[in-house]
Amino acid sequence: MSSTPIKHYLQFSDFTPDEYEYLLDRARILKAKFKNYETWHPLHDRTLAMIFEKNSTRTRLSFEAGIHQLGGHAVFLNTRDSQLGRGEPIEDAAQVISRMVDIIMIRTFGQDIIDRFAAHSRVPVINGLTNEYHPCQVLADVFTYIEQRGSIRGKTVAWIGDANNMAYTWIQAAERLGFTFHFSAPPGYQLDPVMVPASASGLVKVFDDPLAACQGASLVTTDVWTSMGFEAENDARKRAFKDWMVTTAMMDRAEPDALFMHCLPAHRGEEVEAAVIDGPKSVVWDEAENRLHVQKALMEYLLCGRY
């Protein structure tokens, strides 16, 4: 084993602004190669283990296709057909799995699970989603904004909806990349101060009125009202969030060239109007595709360093 410390990607705050500048540019290059059908196999014969405790379409497809396009292979594991669902300690699973593969992506529940796994892994670990953070998605969102509008530094991102893993990851991104984050949610669904780092507090503004939160925003974004694992609260959440649907009126409060994003899957008529997500300011399909390209850049960087 190399004595060089293993680099993981467990939160957005794990990387520096300089690393993000490199990664985002590298994603642009890899996307261009993909569009031009250029073969690029820096991860030839490398193996990615994908561990899913929470189901997903976009996460599995983007990582599995991504490692293949870089010349590697993917192995899919879930709790139904592995010892992970039969009580094997996380630390033991990490020790074993990381001796057989080159890189690991985990989509799970608590952040503590992935932190414990990474602490005992011999290879890089990537957060595919936890209850607390979703760094790969926000990385794709930032890349999509830059691709469409240029630098995000100094801009305003408006989040309309629950204080969930996406919201907390956007806060970390604001601190790392230098933009303002507007947040609006109904009472009872506000940000947890413990999850807002002191270094980002000056960049975060909380609004009771979602229309006011969208004022001057360059990007308006949202997510489902009921995240995975909170299904029992669905009816209560629908009642609480009924005035926090992203509407054309909210988009009209934003900058004239503002974009709309949603990490998907979306529920039209709940967290977003059909006229918004299917309208000219929506870039949700580019956003979804870009998971593929930023994650390729991420895996390449974690395994190969910089080119």
Curated annotation (Swiss-Prot):
The protein's Enzyme Commission number: 2.1.3.3
What one GO molecular function would you report for this record?
A: ornithine carbamoyltransferase activity
Q: Give the record's GO CC terms.
A: cytoplasm
What's the stated role of this polypeptide?
Answer: Reversibly catalyzes the transfer of the carbamoyl group from carbamoyl phosphate (CP) to the N(epsilon) atom of ornithine (ORN) to produce L-citrulline.
Q: Which reaction does it catalyse?
A: carbamoyl phosphate + L-ornithine = L-citrulline + phosphate + H(+)
Q: What is this protein called?
A: Ornithine carbamoyltransferase
Keyword set, alphabetical order:
Arginine metabolism, Cytoplasm, Transferase
Broadest EC class assigned to this enzyme: transferase
Q: Which Pfam families match?
A: OTCace, OTCace_N
User: By its UniProt entry, which InterPro entries does this protein fall under?
Assistant: Asp/Orn_carbamoyltranf_P-bd, Asp/Orn_carbamoylTrfase, Asp/Orn_carbamoylTrfase_sf, Asp_carbamoyltransf_Asp/Orn-bd, Orn/put_carbamltrans, OTCase_ArgI
Q: HAMAP family annotated for this entry? A: OTCase (MF_01109)
Which positions in this protein are listed as binding L-ornithine?
N165, D223, S227, M228
Q: Where in the cell is it found?
A: Cytoplasm
What the record says about family reads: Belongs to the aspartate/ornithine carbamoyltransferase superfamily. OTCase family.
Q: Locate the residues binding carbamoyl phosphate.
A: S56, T57, R58, T59, Q83, R107, H134, P135, C136, Q137, C263, L264, R291
Q: Which gene encodes it?
A: arcB
User: Biological process GO terms, please?
Assistant: arginine biosynthetic process via ornithine; arginine catabolic process to ornithine; citrulline biosynthetic process
Q: According to the UniProt entry, where is the signal peptide? A: none
Q: Where are the transmembrane segments?
A: none
Q: Which pathway does this chain act in? A: Amino-acid degradation; L-arginine degradation via ADI pathway; carbamoyl phosphate from L-arginine: step 2/2
Q: Which organism is it from?
A: Cupriavidus taiwanensis (strain DSM 17343 / BCRC 17206 / CCUG 44338 / CIP 107171 / LMG 19424 / R1) (Ralstonia taiwanensis (strain LMG 19424))
